[in-house]
UniProtKB/Swiss-Prot annotation:
Transmembrane segments annotated in the record for this chain: none
Keyword Translocase: yes
Free-text function comment from the UniProt entry: NDH shuttles electrons from NAD(P)H:plastoquinone, via FMN and iron-sulfur (Fe-S) centers, to quinones in the photosynthetic chain and possibly in a chloroplast respiratory chain. The immediate electron acceptor for the enzyme in this species is believed to be plastoquinone. Couples the redox reaction to proton translocation, and thus conserves the redox energy in a proton gradient.
Pfam families: Fer4_9
UniProt-annotated binding residues for [4Fe-4S] cluster 2: 74, 104, 107, 110
The name this protein goes by in its record: NAD(P)H-quinone oxidoreductase subunit I, chloroplastic
The gene coding this protein: ndhI
Example GO biological process: photosynthesis, light reaction
Length: 167
């Protein structure tokens, strides 16, 4: 009789333990009902990017010294830098700079190691196109600021402010 009572006690303890585990899982599930949804409705809502987001690369032609550090640190040798040596001033003159975003892995090495800070990451992440050749950006396309920067409140205030002329 004693082994039978011990068996029922073990069965009861196992049942209570199982009910406790099920209750813990149920409480975790209920705690998720109070959270805000993470999903966004993409075409109608835009993703809020973090400060360190690595989007499209912005290029400033005037700052570039054609040192090709960006090409050397790129894991896939992506930036194409065309330059000409000016013998009279003994400096390189940048002719063309382009990046193909169809191949770019957005690692950020080019931005990090650029000695003149002519490269920077933007918040732009929408690159959809029907032709992959449209993803090859030259220095003119890389120099354009993304719309999120143009729509910034401070930029709009500066653009809309009346300019005073000192007479």
């Amino acid at each position: 009789m004693l082994p039978m009572i011990t068996g029922f006690m073990n069965y009861g303890q196992q049942t209570l333990r199982a009910a406790r585990y099920i209750g813990q899982g149920f409480m975790i599930t209920l705690s998720h009902t109070n959270r805000l949804p993470v999903t966004i409705q993409y075409p109608y809502e835009k993703l809020i990017t973090s400060e360190r987001f690595r989007g499209r690369i912005h290029f400033e032609f005037d700052k570039c010294i054609a040192c090709e550090v960006c090409v050397r640190v790129c894991p896939i040798d992506l930036p194409v830098v065309d330059w000409k040596l000016e013998t009279n001033i003994r400096k390189k003159r940048l002719l063309n700079y382009s990046i193909d975003f169809g191949i770019c892995i957005f690692c950020g090495n080019c931005v990090e190691y650029c000695p003149t800070n002519c490269l920077s990451m933007t918040e732009e992440y929408e690159f959809s196109t029907y032709d992959r050749h449209e993803l090859n950006y030259n220095q003119i396309a890389l120099g354009r600021l993304p719309m999120s920067v143009i729509d910034d409140y401070t930029i709009r205030t500066i653009l809309n402010s009346p300019q005073t002329i000192n007479g």
